[in-house]
Amino acid sequence: MLWQAYVDDHLMCDIEGHEGHRLTAAAIVGHDGSVWAQSATFPQFKPEEMNGIMTDFNEPGHLAPTGLHLGGTKYMVIQGEAGAVIRGKKGSGGITIKKTGQALVFGIYEEPVTPGQCNMVVERLGDYLLEQGL
């Protein structure tokens, strides 16, 4: 399966039981910052933003004082899973990032999508990729 199909079919799809509700943007990005696939709405990010995210996975808490930045948008870092998931909040929306062996799975949402729904969509694909050795 092509990486774009994972983004289109598993991240940017309707959320189970909530037809018409879907993530605002999504992507799969390699640990080196190379974009494997992304939605048309995924923000253009800077290398230093990706470096900060990777540092936080290796040194949990790194982003807490400054916030998580992606495409110039600042998210307040909220509870995640050290080394596995980073979650951020901004107003009525937020971001979930799941780390796999080779990639980062990003989901960005706005209401009416909830943080829990975003977490479910992103982490389900991330867990699947981990099971596949990716």
From Swiss-Prot:
Main location class: cytoplasm
Q: Which InterPro entries match?
A: PFN (IPR048278), PFN_euk (IPR005455), PFN_sf (IPR036140)
Specify the superkingdom.
Answer: Eukaryota
Q: Indicate where this protein resides in the cell.
A: Cytoplasm, Cytoskeleton
Keywords noted in UniProt: Actin-binding, Allergen, Cytoplasm, Cytoskeleton, Disulfide bond, Phosphoprotein
What the entry lists under SMART domains is as follows: PROF (SM00392)
Looking up Pfam families in the UniProt record yields:
Profilin
Q: Which GO terms describe its cellular component?
A: cell cortex; cytoskeleton
Task: Quote the PTM field.
Answer: Phosphorylated by MAP kinases.
Disulfide-bonded cysteine pairs: these are C13-C118
Record GO terms (molecular function) = actin monomer binding
Report the residues modified as Phosphothreonine: T114
Chain span(s) of sequence motif Involved in PIP2 interaction: 84-100
Q: Which family does it belong to?
A: Belongs to the profilin family.
Additional observations: The variability of the residues taking part of IgE-binding epitopes might be responsible of the difference in cross-reactivity among olive pollen cultivars, and between distantly related pollen species, leading to a variable range of allergy reactions among atopic patients.
Supply the name of the protein. Answer: Profilin-2
